[in-house]
C-alpha cells in the first residue's frame, strides 16, 4: 500500500494514546505501511491531546513528529474547503468530517481510516471508509 492509498482520520490516530493496547497496536501497524493526513488532522490531534488529555506540549509534538515522519501531510486549501462544502451538501456529513474527506479525495486516497464514519461507505466512487477496529 502506498502512502496515498490510506488516509487517517483523527479518531483513529488518537488510539496511539489509548490504554487499549490492541487498538494502539492496530494503528501502529497501519502507520507502518504509511499513509496521508491533513494539517487539520494534526491540529485536531494536538487540540485533543493538549486540552482533553492534558498532555504536555513536548510529548504531543514528539508524537506528531513521528506521525509526520510516516505520513504525507496535505494542506488545507480553498479547493479543500469548496470540495468539503459540496460533500456536506451531498452526504450531510459535518463540515469537519467533510474537510477530512475532501482532503483524502484530493490526495487520491482509496481508503479513509475512521471510527466516526460508516464502515464500508464509498464516497464519490473513490474513497472507502474503513473502521480499522472492525473484525478483519
Language-model features and meaning:
Residues 12-13, 41, 80, 100, ...:
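Alpha-helix capping/helix-boundary segments
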Residues 33-34, 69-70, 91, 108:
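Structured helix-beta-strand junction loops
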Residues 1-2, 101-136:
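Acidic, PIN/NYN-like endoribonuclease modules and their adjacent C-terminal/linker elements
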Amino acid at each position: 500500500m502506498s502512502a496515498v492509498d490510506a488516509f487517517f482520520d483523527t479518531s483513529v490516530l488518537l488510539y496511539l494514546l489509548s490504554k487499549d493496547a490492541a487498538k494502539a497496536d492496530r494503528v501502529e501497524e497501519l502507520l507502518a505501511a504509511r499513509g496521508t493526513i491533513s494539517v487539520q488532522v494534526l491540529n485536531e490531534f494536538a487540540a485533543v491531546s493538549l486540552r482533553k488529555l492534558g498532555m504536555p506540549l513536548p510529548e504531543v509534538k514528539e508524537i506528531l513528529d513521528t506521525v509526520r515522519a510516516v505520513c504525507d501531510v496535505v494542506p488545507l486549501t480553498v479547493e479543500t474547503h469548496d470540495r468539503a462544502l459540496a460533500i456536506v451538501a451531498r452526504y450531510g456529513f459535518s463540515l469537519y468530517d467533510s474537510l477530512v474527506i475532501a482532503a483524502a479525495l484530493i490526495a487520491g486516497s482509496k481508503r479513509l481510516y475512521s471510527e466516526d464514519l460508516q464502515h464500508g461507505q464509498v464516497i464519490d466512487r473513490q474513497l472507502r471508509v474503513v473502521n480499522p477496529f472492525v473484525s478483519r
